[in-house]
């Protein structure tokens, strides 16, 4: 039909997420009448906004990510005088379809957002910098500096939608899968008499007797689907979560051997790699449906149907001859599917979140020397570098004290560092001078 544009179905995208930067702390001094310097009153910066993914039943595809491939949360506001802390950056909540799996750049699965409302923080906002009021202490009564806010996390993630259905209808193109799901549920897929009419999974809810379950009409598979031929991997992905596999066979097609076709589809299912703790696709409960019996008119065609039923019953317990057009055999077929779905557990397995507890004896920094430069790496020292305003000598002195308390100066002495050697921390190069009072580092220019 001309003049109609079907909505695009997108089930795999790569997206960049950037959390908000933390606001800078404020360095200010309270001034009162008769007390021109009444003490520090600089507020701290607000934390940057974080980004969350949330499973939403109103979303069906990832097409919105195709149009917008980068999401950013807002920054935290800077601190102000009179002890006014900066406002926190606004968090960003991004909706995704239920059944969205999230992977990092290395291909490791981070989460599986299956249940409606399930939420995942993908990037965390940067910490706001402390104002000079928070930095004041017995050594520094009135600091003339504040800490800078930290940048927010940045990540590139791959999102994949896998249909959440109890039953998957599989088979070659044009065997009548869309007609079946239209007949047994309220789903209204596009139906036409040519191959690859269905280009994305159609989901339908079936109510048969006391049973209620969901069915997915998976686009037609071809030989080599498990290796990606004919968008096979994209299609097979949507079968991963199903409990029951229904092979739909066109018993009126005289140009294709139904038995060899069944074996070929089974081979593709067996070669598709599922999650480690999931049942292989070819090992799950299966039902064979011989569709389009309304087309069979001659005695020869009827005899062929009986022959196919006898052959397939040797391979599979449940074999049904149906017609999606006349609805013949659908009642018995849908009731049996309900029984199987109730008997076998769902393959939907949300990813559990693991909390990693750091080892007690993990060193807080490491020191090595390459190309004549001592390089210090570690979460704390690199974080402190980002927090330092290098235009302030007092801020640099404060940084040096923190590095010294962490044990970096002693480590440099043990490593054989001498006055004038270069030390790199977090991309910033210092000149080490152990003779300088109160600080062992001077910033190289």
UniProtKB/Swiss-Prot annotation:
Keyword annotations from UniProtKB, A to Z: Cytoplasm, GTP-binding, Hydrolase, Magnesium, Metal-binding, Nucleotide-binding
Gene from which the chain derives: obg
Membership in a protein family: Belongs to the TRAFAC class OBG-HflX-like GTPase superfamily. OBG GTPase family.
OCT domain ranges (all copies): 357-434
Residue intervals of the Obg domain: 7-164
GO cellular component, one term: cytoplasm
Residues the record lists as binding GTP: 171-178, 196-200, 217-220, 291-294, 323-325
GO molecular function, one term: GTPase activity
SUPFAM superfamilies referenced in this protein's UniProt entry, alphabetically: Obg GTP-binding protein C-terminal domain, Obg GTP-binding protein N-terminal domain, P-loop containing nucleoside triphosphate hydrolases
Residues engaged in binding Mg(2+): 178, 198
Example of a GO biological process term: ribosome biogenesis
Function: An essential GTPase which binds GTP, GDP and possibly (p)ppGpp with moderate affinity, with high nucleotide exchange rates and a fairly low GTP hydrolysis rate. Plays a role in control of the cell cycle, stress response, ribosome biogenesis and in those bacteria that undergo differentiation, in morphogenesis control.
Assembly and oligomerization: Monomer.
GTP-binding in keyword set: yes
Residue ranges of domain OBG-type G in the record: 165-342
NCBIfam families noted in UniProt: Obg_CgtA (TIGR02729), Obg_CgtA_exten (TIGR03595), PRK12296.1 (NF008954), PRK12297.1 (NF008955), PRK12299.1 (NF008956)
Compartments reported by the entry: Cytoplasm
Name this protein carries in UniProt: GTPase Obg
Pfam families per the UniProt record, alphabetical: DUF1967, GTP1_OBG, MMR_HSR1
EC number: 3.6.5.-
Co-factor(s): Mg(2+)
């Amino acid at each position: 039909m001309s003049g109609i544009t079907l909505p695009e179905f997108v089930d795999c995208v790569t997206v960049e997420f950037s959390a908000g930067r933390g606001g800078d702390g404020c360095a200010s001094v309270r001034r009162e009448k008769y007390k021109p310097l009444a003490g520090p009153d600089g507020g701290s910066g607000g934390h940057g906004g974080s980004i969350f993914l949330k499973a939403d039943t109103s979303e069906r595809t990832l097409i919105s990510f195709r149009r917008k491939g980068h999401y950013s949360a807002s920054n935290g506001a800077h601190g102000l005088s009179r002890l006014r802390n900066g406002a926190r950056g606004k968090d960003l909540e991004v909706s995704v379809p239920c059944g969205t799996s999230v992977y990092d750049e290395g291909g490791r699965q981070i989460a599986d957002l299956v249940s409606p409302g399930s939420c995942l923080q993908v990037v965390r906002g940067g910490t706001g910098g402390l104002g000079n009021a928070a930095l004041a202490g017995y050594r520094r009564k009135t600091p003339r500096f504040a800490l800078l806010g930290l940048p927010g996390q940045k990540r590139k993630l791959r999102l994949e939608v896998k249909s959440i259905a109890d039953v998957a209808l599989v088979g070659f193109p044009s065997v009548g899968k869309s007609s079946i799901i239209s007949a047994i549920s309220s789903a209204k897929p596009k139906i036409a008499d040519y191959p690859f009419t269905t280009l994305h999974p159609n989901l339908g809810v079936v109510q048969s007797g006391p049973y209620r379950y969901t069915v997915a009409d998976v686009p037609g598979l071809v030989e080599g689907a498990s290796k990606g031929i004919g968008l096979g991997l994209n299609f097979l992905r949507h079968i991963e979560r199903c409990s029951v596999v229904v092979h739909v066979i066109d018993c009126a097609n005289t140009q294709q051997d139904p038995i060899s076709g069944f074996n070929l589809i089974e081979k593709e299912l067996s070669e598709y790699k599922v999650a480690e703790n999931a049942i292989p696709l070819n090992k799950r409960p299966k039902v064979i449906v011989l569709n389009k019996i309304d087309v069979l008119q001659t005695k020869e065609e009827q005899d062929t149907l009986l022959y196919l039923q006898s052959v397939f019953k040797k391979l599979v317990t449940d074999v049904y001859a149906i017609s999606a057009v006349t609805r013949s055999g659908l009642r018995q077929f849908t009731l049996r599917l309900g029984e199987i779905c109730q008997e076998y557990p769902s393959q939907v397995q949300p990813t559990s979140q693991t909390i990693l507890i750091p080892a007690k004896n993990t060193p807080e920094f490491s020191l090595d020397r390459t190309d004549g430069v001592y390089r210090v790496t570690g979460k704390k020292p690199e974080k402190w570098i980002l927090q330092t305003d290098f235009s302030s000598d007092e801020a640099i002195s404060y940084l040096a004290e923190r590095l010294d308390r962490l044990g970096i100066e002693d480590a440099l002495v043990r490593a054989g560092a001498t006055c004038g050697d270069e030390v790199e921390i977090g991309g910033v190069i210092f000149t080490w001078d152990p003779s300088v009072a109160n600080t062992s580092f001077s910033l190289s220019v």
